[in-house]
Amino acid sequence: MAEESLLPSHTEDVSASPNKSSSLLSEISNASTRPFVLAFTVGSCGALSFGCIVGYTAPTQSSIMKDLNLSIADFSFFGSILTVGLILGALICGKLADLVGRVYTIWITNILVLIGWLAIAFAKDVRLLDLGRLLQGISVGISSYLGPIYISELAPRNLRGAASSLMQLFVGVGLSAFYALGTAVAWRSLAILGSIPSLVVLPLLFFIPESPRWLAKVGREKEVEGVLLSLRGAKSDVSDEAATILEYTKHVEQQDIDSRGFFKLFQRKYALPLTIGVVLISMPQLGGLNGYTFYTDTIFTSTGVSSDIGFILTSIVQMTGGVLGVLLVDISGRRSLLLFSQAGMFLGCLATAISFFLQKNNCWETGTPIMALISVMVYFGSYGLGMGPIPWIIASEIYPVDVKGAAGTVCNLVTSISSWLVTYSFNFLLQWSSTGTFMMFATVMGLGFVFTAKLVPETKGKSLEEIQSAFTDSTSEDSTIF
């Protein structure tokens, strides 16, 4: 199946032809069916829950420690066990989604989240508290990759980027809401509130469609066209789309008939997409995201900025960047937003490093706090614009259905380990050198900019089958890359 190249140097604007505007309006209209909207709402709920889960511990720390008589070590373990759950969820997410399907996996993640919140809400000691947090981590580890996959496999090509980008906004909404509510609501009540999204979603899961690409993969070809009709509208002609999905699925199966299991992912033909997915998804973590997120108060305090003002402004900027990303991702494209976002995060890290250097050497004392505040705002705004949602969008687009589960496991595992590494080491790095720490983060983002410019293709406007075949058909070698 020969397709045009997706290499950056040959990228074209597939929506630039005169007839594309009417086609785009038609696809948007067709996509606005009840099953599509319902599926999008349900599929994105994992991101909303993720934001609530991450935002829960900061405002509730003192009250939980007081009520349950916990030590600092107890609460630190409660906070960090989420990462253990993330890693466990990452290890099983791909196999689970491939084995039982996208919808049943969403069932499992929402049940885990619900049990986790209830365990925390009714905890009498640290053991039940930790169990609830662990279950939440497993759920997030699964849903953080499953959500973008499910949305990308259902959405029409012209809405795929915007629909997936909205998931990052849901994370921000959940995070901001729980930060705000946590100052006014008791920690047990806040946990009950956290269970509401799952309680709403569970009955809706009876009415959402399974991914047509997963149906094709498991041999349920007769159901593919019916699902597409429900998603695009009963009057839509989905025969070409259904034929493309079925043809490409058979094409992949014929190529890999002698290759089975997890290690199929490590064939040479998957080397480039695997590298792109792993690097892009881990880059924000290695570029200091968790350091900024969990230790913003430390950064502001060290440079003389009011943490309350800093948090409010950075939240507004990040949400604004996220909204702009949703609006622009299917217009300007993934690659250009990635480059702009990486450049902004690089400048934010660099400016933060300079502000620490000036503060340490007692230079420009009146301007250093303002510089620190602006640098953090630039970092978070740039992250929300591109590096937040787009790596997950691209990772959900570039892998064929037969290795998508394995790729999800690898990408999720790498980002979970990267997240833990930066979170664990950040305070030690600050003690070593505040300036040096943020210079390291700036270096990561600078290298990421070069990586994206050289290797990351533009996927805007392409069908999933076009994107995937452009990678996998570039070589017929089946030898592994290690």
From Swiss-Prot:
The keyword Chloroplast does not apply. GO terms for molecular function: sugar transmembrane transporter activity. GO terms for cellular component: membrane; mitochondrion. It is a multi-pass membrane protein. It holds the Pfam family Sugar_tr. It is found in: Membrane. Residues 1-20 are annotated as: Disordered. InterPro entries: MFS_dom, MFS_ERD6/Tret1-like, MFS_sugar_transport-like, MFS_trans_sf, MFS_Trehalose_Transporter, Sugar/inositol_transpt, Sugar_transporter_CS. Its main location: membrane. The chain crosses the membrane at residues 36-56, 72-92, 103-123, 134-154, 166-186, 189-209, 271-291, 309-329, 337-357, 370-390, 410-430, 436-456. Keywords: Membrane, Sugar transport, Transmembrane, Transmembrane helix, Transport. It comes from the Eukaryota. Sugar transporter. Belongs to the major facilitator superfamily. Sugar transporter (TC 2.A.1.1) family. This is Sugar transporter ERD6-like 14.
